[in-house]
Design a protein with these regions (language model features):
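Conserved, mostly hydrophobic/aromatic
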Residues: 39, 46, 57, 102, ...
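A structural motif
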Residues: 48-51, 107, 160, 217
Length: 248
C-alpha cells in the first residue's frame, strides 16, 4: 500500500483566526440552532456574547438526513457582518463543487466530510480539495461523523488545518453528546501538530467543555447551548466554556 505521506497537500496554509488564534479555546456558536426569523440579530448576539467565530452548517439531504443553510444565506450574513468569521461546515456529497461559491460568499474556513471522499482515491481527492480550498483563500478542515471510525481520517489528518469531530450523528441540532468522541479527540491530538485545530460539534456546552478541552480539543462549536438561552444568558454560557480551559 503506498504511503499517503508521500503525497502531501501542496498549498501553503492560510493565516486566519483559526490557524493563528488570538486565544484558545475558540468558541464557535453554531447558528443551526438560532432563531431564523431574526438570524442576523442572533448572529450579532452570539459574537457580542464572546463568540470568536460563527459555525455555519450546510446540509444537502443526501450526505446527512436534513437540509440546512446555503451559499446565499452566508453571503447575506457576511454582507451584514463583514467583520465576522464564518466557519462553513459542508455536510454535503459534493464539497468540491461548492468550495468556490462559499469562498465568494465570504467564508473564511471550509470543512468537508471524509464520508464524501469515497473510493480508492479518497486520500488523493481529499488532499486535492484541501489545496483547492486554500487556493481560494480559506483554511481547510476535514470532518468525521459520529458513527465513522476515526481511522478513516488517517490519510488526511496531517494535511488539514482543522479536524472536526462530530460527537453526534450529523444532521440535527439538540442531540445528546456521545462520550466516544473523547477517544477520537485523543486519537487525533496524538497524530497532528499543535497548530492543527481540533473542533468538536454536537451536544457541546458548559457541562462537557472541560472534558473536551482536556482531551485535546481547542475549538468548541455550540449550537443549542448558546442559541436556546436568552441573549443575556449567552455571555455566561460562552464564558463558562472558555473558562473550562483553566478549570475555572
Amino acid at each position: 500500500m503506498p504511503s499517503h505521506a508521500s503525497q502531501p497537500a501542496t498549498s501553503r496554509p492560510i493565516t486566519n483566526v483559526l490557524t493563528n488564534p488570538p486565544q484558545l479555546p475558540l468558541i464557535a456558536p453554531s447558528i443551526l440552532a438560532a432563531d431564523y426569523t431574526k438570524l442576523g440579530e442572533e448572529c450579532r448576539s452570539a459574537i457580542e456574547a464572546g463568540g470568536d467565530l460563527l459555525h455555519f452548517d450546510v446540509m444537502d439531504g443526501h450526505l446527512v438526513p436534513n437540509l440546512a443553510l446555503g451559499v446565499d444565506m452566508l453571503a447575506s450574513l457576511k454582507a451584514a457582518m463583514p467583520d465576522a468569521f464564518f466557519d462553513a461546515h459542508l455536510m454535503i456529497e459534493r464539497p468540491d463543487v461548492f468550495a468556490e461559491p462559499f469562498a465568494q460568499a465570504g467564508a473564511e474556513h471550509l470543512t468537508f466530510h471524509i464520508e464524501a471522499m469515497n473510493g480508492e482515491m479518497a486520500g488523493d481527492r481529499g488532499r486535492a480539495l484541501i489545496d483547492t480550498i486554500r487556493g481560494l483563500g480559506m483554511s481547510a478542515g476535514i470532518a468525521i461523523d459520529g458513527p465513522t471510525a476515526i481511522e478513516k481520517a488517517d490519510a488526511l489528518l496531517e494535511h488539514a488545518d482543522l479536524v472536526l469531530i462530530m460527537a453526534i450523528r450529523a444532521g440535527f441540532s439538540g442531540q445528546a453528546f456521545a462520550p466516544a468522541a473523547l477517544d477520537k479527540i485523543r486519537y487525533v491530538r496524538e497524530r497532528v501538530s499543535e497548530t492543527t485545530r481540533i473542533e468538536v460539534d454536537g451536544g457541546v456546552g458548559p457541562a462537557n467543555a472541560a472534558d473536551l478541552l482536556q482531551a485535546g480539543a481547542d475549538v468548541l462549536a455550540a449550537a443549542s447551548a448558546v442559541f436556546r438561552v436568552s441573549p443575556p444568558e449567552r455571555v455566561s454560557v460562552i464564558t463558562q466554556m472558555r473558562g473550562s480551559a483553566s478549570g475555572s
